[in-house]
């Protein structure tokens, strides 16, 4: 797999289909109990990734969340740091900062991510969320916010705050690096 994907990070972020295809190309062994042509290795790697994400999410539950804490940053890296396509996550919190839920959106394109404002506002009201955090990744490797990121954040902040929902931060993840637009003075 390393020969095919080039690194453990790339293996970790690959889909089960891509993993199984790579295994088939190098004569990997299938899982006889998985059915005709079934592969268990790709599914097991993806399941392990989901388990690691759930364990990181668990650290957010039950306590007020601060975007500067190592636990929160670890969670964002787990969810977004290795993805090859730009994705956006909206995290919903109570007024006291307790984690309620998250929504995950993928644009499937590099260099562009759209924050779904209508869906975000509707979901915030459905959850009775009082605070939001936006996070998205830059597969390019630079966590620095673009001009488009700054403009989208300002637009979102104006919309949600007019509806009495706070936008606490917009974090950008690139690999293991995270930039907080709030900490950078961009919000």
Predicted regions mapped to residue ranges:
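Long amphipathic alpha-helical segments
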Residues: 1-61
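Generic alpha-helical secondary structure signal
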Residues: 9, 17, 39-40, 67-74, ...
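Short, intrinsically disordered/low-complexity patches at protein termini
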Residues: 20-23, 64-68, 123-126
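Generic recognition of cysteine residues
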Residues: 31-34, 87, 171
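Active-site-proximal loop/helix of nucleotide/amide-processing enzymes and allied scaffolds
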Residues: 37-44, 74, 78, 92, ...
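Non-catalytic interface/targeting segments
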Residues: 56-106, 182-187
């Amino acid at each position: 797999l390393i020969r095919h994907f080039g690194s453990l990070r790339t293996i970790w972020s690959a889909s089960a289909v891509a993993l199984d295809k790579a295994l088939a190309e190098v004569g990997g062994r299938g899982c006889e109990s998985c059915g005709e042509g079934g592969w268990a290795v790709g599914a097991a790697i993806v399941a392990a990734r989901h388990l690691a994400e759930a364990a990181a999410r668990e650290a957010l539950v039950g306590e007020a969340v601060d975007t500067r804490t190592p636990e929160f940053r670890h969670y964002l890296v787990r969810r977004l740091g290795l993805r090859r396509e730009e994705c956006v996550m909206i995290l919903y919190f109570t007024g006291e900062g307790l984690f309620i839920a998250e929504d995950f959106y993928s644009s499937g394109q590099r260099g562009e991510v759209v924050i779904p404002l209508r869906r975000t506002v509707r979901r915030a009201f459905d959850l009775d969320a009082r605070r939001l955090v936006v996070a998205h990744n830059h597969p390019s490797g630079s966590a620095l916010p673009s001009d488009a990121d700054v403009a989208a954040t300002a637009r979102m902040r104006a919309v949600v705050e007019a509806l009495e929902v706070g936008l606490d931060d917009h974090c950008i993840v690139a690999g293991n690096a995270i930039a907080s637009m709030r900490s950078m003075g961009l919000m």
